[in-house]
Amino acid sequence: MKPFMDADFLLQTDTAKTLYHEAAEKMPIFDYHNHLNPQEILEDRQMENLTRVWLGGDHYKWRAMRAMGFSEDLITGNADDYDKYLAFAETIENAIGNPLYHWTHLELQRYFGITTPLSRATAKELWDEANAKLQTKEFTVRNLILNQHVSHLCTTDDPADDLHCHLALQKEDFACRVLPSFRPDRAVHLEKPDFPEYVEKLAAAASRTIASAEDMVHALSCRLDFFLSAGCVVSDHSLEGCFYVPCTAAEANDVFENRMNGGALTEKELGMYKGFLLTNLGLLYHKHNIAMQLHIKALRNNSKRMFRALGADTGFDSMNDFAFAPMLGAFLNDMDEDDALPKTVLYSLNPGDNPMLASMAGNFAAPGIRSKVQFGTAWWFNDHKYGMESQLATLSSIGMLSTFIGMLTDSRSFLSFPRHEYFRRILCNQIGNWVENGEYPANLEFLKEMVENISYNNAVSYFL
């Protein structure tokens, strides 16, 4: 029997161990997509206890706790922090096969030096030990980031945000660069009830009137310029339905006007406006040499009762299953026709789309850019061991694994950075298996360089 999560965790061959310990393990982290709060980084917040640092916004954990039957009071409610923690400890003890189990114990090991498995029986011991360390200066938010050698992290930000935290952090002596990401979902999703209110908010931020779809593009262009001045290198879009129908500017303007006047819109009209906006944004991204991320197929807020109670992003989203390959190909081609397609990263929440996305990425290449269109890492419901193995196998079978930009956390927790380690171990194990099965030569120096590139260097080259 192998030891529990020891130094060679997930590394099944000698080649895998060599690649991880001599290459992947030492590399810094470029976390190009997360949902961390920049205000907490600026303030260098000190987390009060394990409950606050673990359960303060992590819907992965909330879903697992709900599956265990715990009351919402113990999850997102006003119950005592220790009682919430005990419920989480019991949840983790029961979470065999779930990535939460591995993530939680990697976090305990890497940040706190705790190797005891978390359970209801060990909860008090681990609570006391970890909380004592959380009160020291080594465990402020900034030190949690530096602990894992994070060189860059990209938060997720609305175009109307003032980015005061990012701008203030640029003036401070903090070794990690905290960069904003441009996420204009609220400008794109005109079917949302609060769209008219958001138009007013964005217009105020851009200091210009927004009375048409073309005005919206100009306002977003203005805000993108501001984001670029704050160090932005990447945009992000959530695409949840029909997102591209070719149309003229006049047609997009008509759809916008109809929406602002309270009219009902067809799915085609939604696709026309969204396609017009996304295409014009893509052209701007290409002009400014920033990457465009497309996160596709989240089916959000399925429990309307819980959405009314808790709001969005609280654990009631799942995978969608609509067909979108022709639409995606046409959207990317629209920009590529003018040789103005930006660097693009494709993700789908439904793993059934993996071969399609990997093959789609290969349609659009450019001299001097390695894998200009990337098949993105296993995302959200897929960032577990088997999901990552599947994504890596699909990418290597259809595309070029060596040019892959690697992992991200997509997390709201400052303890989430060991997810990069989790990915790197899985990567090294996959390559190690190929080598030891005689499917690739044991050229360890070349392979170590490849692993270093996938772990960090490729992302630096791609985004910077």
What function would you assign to each model-found segment?
Residues 324-328:
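Divalent-cation-assisted or electrostatically stabilized phosphate/pyrophosphate-binding catalytic cores
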Residues 331-337:
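Short, basic/hydrophobic alpha-helical segments
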Residues 292-294:
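C-terminal amphipathic alpha-helical interaction region
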Residues 1-288, 340-342, 346-358, 362-464:
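Metal-cofactor-binding active-site regions of metalloenzymes
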